Amino acid sequence: MRQRFGMLFQNGALLTDLTVFENVAFPLREHTKLSNRLIRHVVLTKLHAVGLRGAADMTPAQLSGGMARRVALARAMVMDPEILIYDEPFVGLDPISLGVIVRLVRRLNDALGITSIVVSHDVEEIATVADTSFLLSNGKVAASGSPDELRTANSE
């Protein structure tokens, strides 16, 4: 069941003693019996998908915040999950990295056809990546709908 889910943690949760390649390969090594050759192919494909194929030999300490978030995203999707959960994916990013991550999340959703659950306080950015949003207030759903529906309801 766990292998059907991918998780992008707010802080990335990269293992500091491992290279970028090894961080992304970690779930494959733990949960599959794939050969090293196939693991290499899958990891480099996922790094390419997030625009970081050339960073495979770097360590987390050598990465910018935006790069680290993309490596964590590659790791979250390395098992080809059906559902990808993002915990505050936009927090702490500079405007350029924020734009990259927003476009990447939208592109991956569209290309992979997976279900993504994005937990965020950034309502503006959610509107650019979500098909449907749920706004919570005091632990209850205060509103739901497409970004356009929520904008219309908010302006009335």
Identify the role of each PLM range.
Residues 80:
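Conserved catalytic motifs of ABC-family nucleotide-binding domains
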